Amino acid sequence: KSRHGIVLAKSTLAKQYGIVTGEPLFQARRKCPGLVVVPPNYQLYVRKSDQLIRMLHEYTPLIQQYSIDEAWMDMTGIQEAQADPMGFATGLKDRIHRELGFTVNIGISVNHLLAKMGSELQKPDRVHTLFPEEIPQKMWPLPVDELFFVGKTTAAHLHKLGIHTIGELARTDPRLLEMHLKKHGRAIWKYANGGELDAAVFERRSSKNKGYGNETTLPDDVTDMETACQGILSLCETVGARLRQDNMKISVVGVHVKDNSFTERS
């Protein structure tokens, strides 16, 4: 009956029941009473991530790791990849599955944004191309919230403007988007048209531990300040311990809250 814990990742089958990443486990179990829940094993993820990156370096030194399970490979000048991109990527995908024991999706294109979007087209264990000439057919029909860097809040703003697909976003006057979403509006308009990611995206990922954080899902709704402060104190103690371990100091503290309707405030 406790709602402790959230969904960190879900299988393709669980997704068919409407289970989404970030929702409390008690809600996920309502959607799928027979749900199998496996506790996370972060050290295993780190080890497998390291093995994957080492394998990718066997093919090219130009690797940009975006997260624990995402990386871009620059295959410019790699003759085998240039001659048969789909064949090369399929071979790499199969090798990862065979030697490391997990499946991956690979997207192929001319820039980071399109390769990332290509990798998300259909899962699991797939290879997709998303070249500029394929954008109208493959990317524009997708819901706008599937575009890289369009989160729930931005998607809600776009829906109010009558923008529901990536194609509609691509055809919107960027000045209108800037009026409502500032610089982010023009950035996502560029992405909707297949433009390259901004350099700041990679700069934010280039330095480790620019920020320290911790989060939890409380077992019950909290409506009084004392209980809320106790929860925040517990999180602060964990973050403080990590800061002391790394001999770091901070200048800004932020608190992020999500209520039971998934409305976020910070």
Annotate each language-model stretch with its function:
Residues 1-187, 203, 241:
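Gly/Gly-Pro- and Ser/Thr-rich, intrinsically disordered tail segments characteristic of DNA damage-repair
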Residues 146, 156-266:
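DNA-contacting surface of Y-family translesion DNA polymerases
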